[in-house]
């Protein structure tokens, strides 16, 4: 019973997405501007510091309150400090 309800909800969701895409028109979906906007979403962002579990070589690579853990592979972990 639960499986059939989940399958029904999934099918309805897919149908909703397809009909909303058709309403917008295929010319909008094929436009280069749309493709460029999607490209920007998936490009990696260069940051000044590494976030939690990000790769690092030294403590200064990591963001505030994080330190470089030198276990293989090296990663940024919490340095047990607090602040604003």
From Swiss-Prot:
Annotated source species: Chilobrachys guangxiensis (Chinese earth tiger tarantula)
Domain notes from UniProt: The presence of a 'disulfide through disulfide knot' structurally defines this protein as a knottin.
Pfam families membership: Toxin_12
Record-stated family: Belongs to the neurotoxin 10 (Hwtx-1) family. 05 (F4a) subfamily.
The protein's name in its UniProt record: U21-theraphotoxin-Cg1b
Location(s), subcellular: Secreted
Propeptide section residues: 22-47
GO cellular component: extracellular region
